[in-house]
Amino acid sequence: MLPYPPSIRNAISHLSRLPGIGQKTAERLAMHLLHVPDRAVHELARSLVDLKKNTRMCSVCFTLSDTPVCAICGDPDRNASLLCVVEGPTEVMAIEKTAAFKGVYHVLHGVLSPMDGIGPDDIRIRELVDRVKKGIVKEIVLATDTRVEGEATAAYLVEVLKPFPVTVTRIASGMPAGGEVRYSDPVTLKNAMEKRYAL
């Protein structure tokens, strides 16, 4: 069997580096791209370049945005006194799909994981404390995953936030033990947000 030409091998190699894309799927994608109109391939390439060029972190909550302040932080109808702390931007999107939360977010960009060398200075805990010090936030909802690292991060945040006059709550049942926020269905997340509890 003849090997693929270099241009196809190169495309397969790059596609297979994406999460969840193995060699076979990368081959199928490369073959598909060879058969779609040139315009579609150029639009895909342009969208990928734009993704890298235009996506940044919101200067307030650190979720993904294409503007300095994201649409959620810039929305005057959101309750700025209610702050939901999540691990990453995908959790923001998952909670937003429920339409059950009307507050604002703080994205940590990770969880505490000593085994992986990730400590408090490696995620956006300092920025969270800075937001709380401003006195606008009255309730903090900890919506980290229920895996060991997420629970440890939530417990650490409870201690860090004790000196401040804020109510700290945790998303409630509905999230399975060891479950991840980003993979939960909207109904489960809605129930978890509505049944949060004080810590």
Swiss-Prot record:
SUPFAM superfamilies tied to this protein: Recombination protein RecR (SSF111304)
Residue ranges of domain Toprim in the record: 81-176
InterPro entries: DNA_Rcmb_RecR (IPR000093), Rcmb_RecR (IPR023627), Rcmb_RecR_Znf (IPR015967), TOPRIM_dom (IPR006171), TOPRIM_RecR (IPR034137)
C4-type zinc finger locations on the chain: 58-73
UniProt keyword annotations, A-Z: DNA damage, DNA recombination, DNA repair, Metal-binding, Zinc, Zinc-finger
Pfam family, one: RecR_ZnF
Superkingdom of origin organism: Bacteria
A single BP term in Gene Ontology: DNA repair
GO molecular function, one term: zinc ion binding
Keyword Metal-binding: yes
Family listed: Belongs to the RecR family.
Role according to the record: May play a role in DNA repair. It seems to be involved in an RecBC-independent recombinational process of DNA repair. It may act with RecF and RecO.
Protein name per UniProt: Recombination protein RecR
Gene: recR
